[in-house]
A protein has these predicted regions:
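The conserved 3'-phosphoadenosine-5'-phosphosulfate
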Residues: 34-43, 89-96, 114-116, 150-212
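PAPS-dependent sulfotransferase catalytic core
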Residues: 1-62
């Protein structure tokens, strides 16, 4: 049963958030890095959900106490309806410019090329992009920026304020612990998956440049 639903876009500290939530909740948190271990099941399941097919979220997310990052964050509204007692955490960068640079330095690299271009994986990536950014082309900075701001406003409009936590990694444990009613752990807040660290993992990224394990 999910206790935390992530609504933040990729490259907004989602790997950091995953680690923090796993510490707080004592259970796994779904993230794009998990999908790489579930390539036979997750891409088809999330693609079917994006197409409007009936989705068994309990089965897809069995064993997880939280779900952040794509693909799950693209379905934050559906998940919030399915799990009404869960809080929704929208992780953010400090500006569109820093987010755009981080994405272009990492997960956008080669996203539209490679042998994954026609696979279920590629179809899943395209589907979650469309759910998040509509018809904005990934190469059109202005269109993506407009869609980026619309996305955040849509989350604020659809998630009740009492359930929504807007989170930046610099905030540390406080906002998460307050929202979950949990004590602050006696350990430093994790800070993971910088652009440099992402590039150290590029050997793990499949052809096509889709987000790899740790793709925050």
């Amino acid at each position: 049963m999910l206790r935390v639903i992530g609504a933040g876009l990729p490259r907004t500290g989602t790997m950091t958030l995953k680690s923090a939530l796993e510490t707080l909740l004592g259970a796994p948190c779904h993230h794009m890095s998990e999908v790489f271990q579930r390539v036979e099941t997750d891409p088809p399941a999330f693609l079917a959900a994006a197409r409007g097919e009936r989705t068994d979220w309990d089965a897809i997310l069995a064993g997880y106490a939280a779900a952040v990052d794509w693909p799950a964050s693209a379905f934050h509204a559906e998940l919030a309806e399915r799990y009404p007692d869960a809080i929704v955490v929208m992780s953010r960068r400090d500006s569109f410019d820093t987010w755009w640079k981080s994405c272009n330095d990492t997960i956008f690299t080669g996203m539209d090329t490679g042998e994954y271009a026609t696979s279920a994986w590629r179809a899943m990536i395209d589907a979650v992009w469309e759910k998040s950014f509509g018809n904005a082309p990934r190469s059109d900075r202005d269109a993506v920026e407009a869609a980026y701001h619309r996305y955040h406003e849509r989350v604020r409009e659809t998630v009740p304020a009492e359930r929504l936590v807007e989170f930046t990694t610099g905030a540390g444990w406080g906002p998460l612990c307050d929202a979950l009613g949990l004590p602050v752990p006696d350990e430093p807040f994790p800070y993971l998956n910088t652009t440099r660290e992402w590039h150290e993992r590029t050997g793990e990224v499949p052809p096509g440049g889709v987000p790899g394990p740790g793709g925050s």
